[in-house]
C-alpha cells in the first residue's frame, strides 16, 4: 500500500534520529514489518523531538494503525496521493498543540456520521459534530490538545482548528490547519481548516459549520491577507504536494505558502549585499505592523547569491535583517515595489513616521448563499450549542452528585469543565490543614490549566513545595513558590523529565521554587528572577538601563508598544500602563505609536534608540493625528435583510439608496448604546440633514428610557428588527467585533461602507455628522 519511495524516505529520516529514540521504543518498532513499520518510522523520523522523547509508544502505534485502516478501506472512493496521506492523515500532530491520544476516540464518535457519504459531505458532517463539541473562547497562547478541547467545549481559533483537523484525520479525511499569522488590516490573526477532497483543497471555518465547503465568515479578511500558510512535519512530496512553495523550516515544521489561493499576490524578490559581495545565509524577517509592533510573518534565508523570495499580498511589509553585527530595516509597499536591495550597515537611531498600508480586498468568486440551506444550518448550529452545553454541564453535575463537595470547591469544579474529575480528585486528597493552600494554589493557575492539569501533577507540587513555607508571607509564597504555573507550558511535575520539557528560563524558575525561593519570569523580558530583600533580581545579571515613558489615552498592545531588537526580530516587552518607569536590559529598541484608520491602514511614529548600561532615557508618546478624510474608506458589505414591525422584509440596499446613510445596530438598555442614544437625542436633526438614519434593533425587542425619550421626541423614525442576526456577518465584513454595540455603518450607497465602528466612543455622533458631509 505504501510505496518504495515512501519507505526509503521514512527509513532515512528514522535512521538519522536513532540516537534520540529510546532502545525500548526502537525494539517495539522493529517488531513490526511492512506498512506499519514504515508508518512508525515516518512519525518517529519526522515529528518534533519532544514527541519522540515523551509521547507514549502506544499513542503513536494507535495513530499509525488507525490511519492505515482508513487508507486501506478508502470508504470515500477518492484517490488520495501518498504525500497528502502521510502529512495530513497519518500525522497525529497539527501545530504546537499538547500531544494527546485521540485517534480511535474521535473515529468511534464519528464513524456513523460519515458512513456512506462523499468525502465533501463527510467533512461537512464532521465539522457540524465539531460545533456540537467545541465553540470559540478567547484564552492564552498555549495551545490545548484535541481531547482537552473536547472535554472543555471551548477553544480559541487555533485550538478549534487543531481539534477539527484531528477529528477529520481520524476518519481518513486529509485536513490541515491554515493560518494567517497576523492580519495587516486589523490587530488580530486567524486559523481555519482546509480539507482535500480529490479535486483539490477546500476551506471551512473550524467548528463553524456551513452547508457547503468554501464558505466562512473569515473570507473577507483572508482576501486582504499578506501571508497565509499551512504546516506539515515532513518534506515528503510526491504527486499531491510537489507544487507547494516552502516558505521556511521552523524547527521540525515546514511552512507552505497558500496566500495566492486567498488573496491577490506578488512575488517579492530580496537581495542582501555587503560591500560588493552577496550575503549568503542571512535571515530576512518579513514583518507586519500589528498591535503596535513589527511582528514576524515569515523568516527567509538568503541563498548562495544572497537572494530570497516570497509570494505575499499587496500591501506594506517591514524588512528587518541583523547579520554579523550589521543591520537593515525598511518598509516596503509590495503593491508598488517588489525588488528590494538590502545593504546592512549601522543601526539607525531616531524617529521615523509614515503610513503602513493594508492590502485592498481581492475580488470574491463566492456564489450567493442559499437562504433555505443557511436557515437549516443556523437551526443545526443552535441545536449544536444546546447539545454542547448539556454535555459540559453534565461533568459538573455528575461529579457533585457522586461526591460530597464543600461549597467553596464548586467554582473550581465548574471551571474545570470536563476535567472536573481531576480537579475534584485533587481536592478530595487534601487534609484539613492543607486545604486552604490547595484552594489558593488553584487560584494561581489559568483557566486552561484548570481544564487540562491532572490531580497527580497538582499533588506533586503540594507535597514538594508546601513544606518550604517557613513563615514566608502568604501572598509571596502562594504566587511565587507554591504556584505550579510559570509561563506558557502545561503544568507538570518538576522532576527530571518535566524540567527537560521547559525552556531555560522556566526551568530555572522551577528549580528556585522547589528550593523554597520566590521566583518568576520577568513580566517585561521573560527572564528568570528571584526575590531578594523585597526586590526582584535577575537570576543572570545583564547590563541594565532605565526607561521612563509618559502619554495620555494610549493602550499598550493597541496604540503603543516597546520592542527589543534581537537577531533581526522585534520582541515585545510587557511594560504595563503609562506613565511608567522601569529598568530594562541595555540594547537596541523600537518604541512605536500607531493610529489605525478605518481603511485598515496605520499611521505610525517609530522611535529607534539604543539604551546603554546605566543610562536613563525618557520619552512622551503621542498618537499620530489623522485628517478627517483619512477616516473614510471603502468596504463592501454583504447583502442583508431587516424587517419592519409588521414582519415585512427590507434589503438594507433599498434603505440606503442615495449618497449617505447611517445604519445603526443598537442594543437599548446596554450602557454603550445608552450613551450613543443620549448623543443621538441631542444631534439627530443635524445628523438626519446630512444622511438617512436607519436604526436596527435586536429581535428580542429590547427598549430603554433613553430609547423611549429619543423616539418620543422625533416621532417617526426608520426602525427595523434584526430578525436574521445580520449584524454578525456585517460586522465581520467591516472587520469589527460582532455583538459590540452600538454597531455603526456609514454608507455611501449600498454595499459601499465608508466608515464603521463598534462599541461606544465619546463624540461618535458628531464624528458621523462630519464624515457624512464629506460623502
Where are these regions (language model features)?
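Secondary-structure boundary elements
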Residues: 2-152, 374-496
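Short active-site neighborhood of thiol/selenol oxidoreductases, capturing the structured segment around
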Residues: 652-680, 693-695
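Short Pro-Gly-centered beta-turn/loop motif in secreted/extracellular proteins
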Residues: 305-325, 331-335, 412-415, 577-599, ...
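Hydrophobic/aromatic-rich core segments of domains that either
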Residues: 108-128, 137-147, 152-248, 257, ...
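Thioredoxin-like thiol-disulfide oxidoreductase module
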Residues: 701-740
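Thiol/disulfide oxidoreductase modules built on the thioredoxin-like
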Residues: 724-770
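Short, acidic Ser/Thr/Gly-rich low-complexity loop/linker segments typical of extracellular
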Residues: 290-312, 566-580
Amino acid at each position: 500500500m505504501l510505496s518504495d519511495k515512501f519507505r526509503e524516505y521514512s527509513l532515512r529520516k528514522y535512521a538519522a534520529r536513532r540516537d534520540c529514540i529510546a532502545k525500548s521504543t526502537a525494539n517495539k518498532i522493529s517488531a513490526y514489518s511492512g506498512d506499519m513499520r514504515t508508518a512508525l518510522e515516518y512519525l518517529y523520523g519526522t515529528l518534533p523531538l519532544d514527541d519522540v522523547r515523551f509521547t507514549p509508544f502506544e499513542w503513536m502505534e494507535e495513530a499509525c494503525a488507525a490511519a492505515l485502516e482508513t487508507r486501506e478501506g478508502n470508504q470515500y472512493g477518492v484517490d488520495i496521493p501518498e504525500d497528502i496521506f502521510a502529512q495530513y492523515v497519518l500525522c497525529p500532530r497539527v501545530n504546537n498543540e499538547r500531544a494527546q491520544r485521540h485517534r480511535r476516540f474521535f473515529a468511534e464518535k464519528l464513524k456513523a456520521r460519515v458512513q456512506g457519504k462523499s468525502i465533501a459531505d463527510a467533512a461537512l458532517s464532521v465539522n457540524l459534530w465539531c460545533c456540537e463539541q467545541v465553540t470559540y473562547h478567547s484564552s492564552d497562547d498555549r495551545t490545548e490538545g484535541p481531547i482537552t478541547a473536547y472535554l472543555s467545549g471551548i477553544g480559541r481559533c487555533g485550538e478549534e482548528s487543531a481539534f477539527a483537523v484531528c477529528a477529520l484525520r481520524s476518519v481518513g479525511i486529509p485536513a490541515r490547519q491554515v493560518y494567517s499569522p497576523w492580519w495587516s488590516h486589523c490587530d488580530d490573526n486567524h486559523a481555519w481548516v482546509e480539507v482535500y477532497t480529490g479535486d483539490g483543497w477546500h476551506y471551512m471555518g473550524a467548528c463553524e459549520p456551513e452547508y457547503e465547503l468554501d464558505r466562512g465568515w473569515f473570507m473577507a479578511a483572508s482576501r486582504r491577507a499578506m501571508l497565509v500558510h499551512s504546516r506539515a512535519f515532513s518534506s515528503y512530496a510526491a504527486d499531491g504536494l510537489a507544487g507547494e512553495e516552502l516558505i521556511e523550516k521552523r524547527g521540525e515544521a515546514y511552512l507552505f505558502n497558500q496566500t495566492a489561493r486567498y488573496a491577490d499576490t506578488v512575488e517579492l524578490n530580496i537581495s542582501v549585499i555587503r560591500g560588493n559581495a552577496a550575503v549568503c545565509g542571512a535571515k530576512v524577517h518579513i514583518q507586519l505592523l500589528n498591535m503596535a509592533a513589527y511582528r514576524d510573518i515569515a523568516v527567509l534565508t538568503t541563498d548562495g547569491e544572497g537572494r530570497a523570495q516570497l509570494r505575499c499580498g499587496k500591501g506594506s511589509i517591514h524588512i528587518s535583517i541583523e547579520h554579523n553585527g550589521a543591520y537593515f530595516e525598511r518598509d516596503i509597499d509590495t503593491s508598488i515595489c517588489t525588488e528590494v536591495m538590502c545593504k546592512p550597515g549601522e543601526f539607525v537611531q531616531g524617529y521615523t513616521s509614515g503610513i503602513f498600508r493594508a492590502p485592498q480586498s481581492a475580488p470574491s468568486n463566492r456564489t450567493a448563499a442559499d437562504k433555505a440551506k443557511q436557515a437549516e444550518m443556523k437551526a443545526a448550529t443552535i441545536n449544536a450549542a444546546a447539545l454542547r452545553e448539556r454535555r459540559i454541564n453534565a461533568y459538573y453535575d455528575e461529579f457533585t452528585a457522586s461526591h460530597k463537595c464543600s461549597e467553596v470547591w464548586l467554582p473550581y469544579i465548574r471551571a474545570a469543565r470536563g476535567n472536573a474529575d481531576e480537579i475534584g480528585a485533587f481536592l478530595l486528597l487534601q487534609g484539613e490543614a492543607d486545604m486552604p493552600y490547595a484552594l489558593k494554589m488553584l487560584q494561581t493557575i489559568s483557566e486552561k490549566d484548570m481544564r487540562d492539569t491532572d490531580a497527580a501533577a497538582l499533588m506533586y507540587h503540594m507535597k514538594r513545595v508546601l513544606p518550604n513555607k517557613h513563615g514566608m508571607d502568604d501572598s509571596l509564597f502562594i504566587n511565587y513558590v507554591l504556584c505550579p504555573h510559570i509561563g506558557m507550558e502545561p503544568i507538570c511535575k518538576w522532576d527530571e523529565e518535566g524540567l527537560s520539557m521547559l525552556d531555560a528560563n522556566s526551568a530555572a524558575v522551577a528549580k528556585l521554587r522547589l528550593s523554597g525561593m520566590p521566583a518568576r519570569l520577568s513580566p517585561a523580558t521573560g527572564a528568570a528572577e528571584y526575590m531578594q530583600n523585597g526586590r526582584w533580581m535577575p537570576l543572570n545579571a545583564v547590563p541594565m538601563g532605565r526607561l521612563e515613558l509618559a502619554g495620555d489615552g494610549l493602550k499598550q498592545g493597541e496604540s503603543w508598544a516597546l520592542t527589543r531588537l534581537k537577531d533581526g526580530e522585534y520582541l515585545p516587552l510587557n511594560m504595563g500602563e503609562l506613565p511608567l518607569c522601569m529598568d530594562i536590559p541595555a540594547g537596541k529598541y523600537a518604541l512605536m505609536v500607531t493610529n489605525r484608520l478605518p481603511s485598515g491602514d496605520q499611521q505610525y511614529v517609530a522611535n529607534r534608540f539604543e539604551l546603554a548600561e546605566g543610562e536613563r532615557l525618557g520619552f512622551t508618546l503621542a498618537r499620530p493625528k489623522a485628517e478627517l478624510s483619512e477616516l473614510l474608506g471603502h468596504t463592501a458589505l454583504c447583502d442583508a435583510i431587516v424587517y419592519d414591525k409588521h414582519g415585512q422584509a427590507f434589503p438594507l440596499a433599498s434603505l440606503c439608496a442615495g449618497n449617505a446613510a447611517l445604519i445603526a445596530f443598537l442594543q437599548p438598555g446596554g450602557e454603550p448604546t445608552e450613551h450613543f442614544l443620549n448623543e443621538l437625542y441631542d444631534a439627530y436633526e443635524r445628523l438626519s440633514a446630512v444622511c438617512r438614519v436607519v436604526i436596527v434593533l435586536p429581535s428580542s425587542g429590547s427598549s430603554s428610557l433613553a430609547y423611549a425619550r429619543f423616539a418620543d421626541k422625533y416621532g417617526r423614525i426608520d426602525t427595523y428588527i434584526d430578525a436574521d442576526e445580520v449584524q454578525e456577518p456585517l460586522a465581520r465584513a467591516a472587520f469589527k467585533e460582532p455583538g459590540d454595540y452600538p454597531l455603526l455603518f456609514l454608507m455611501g450607497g449600498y454595499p459601499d461602507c465608508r466608515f464603521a465602528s463598534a462599541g461606544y466612543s465619546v463624540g461618535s455622533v458628531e464624528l458621523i455628522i462630519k464624515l457624512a458631509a464629506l460623502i
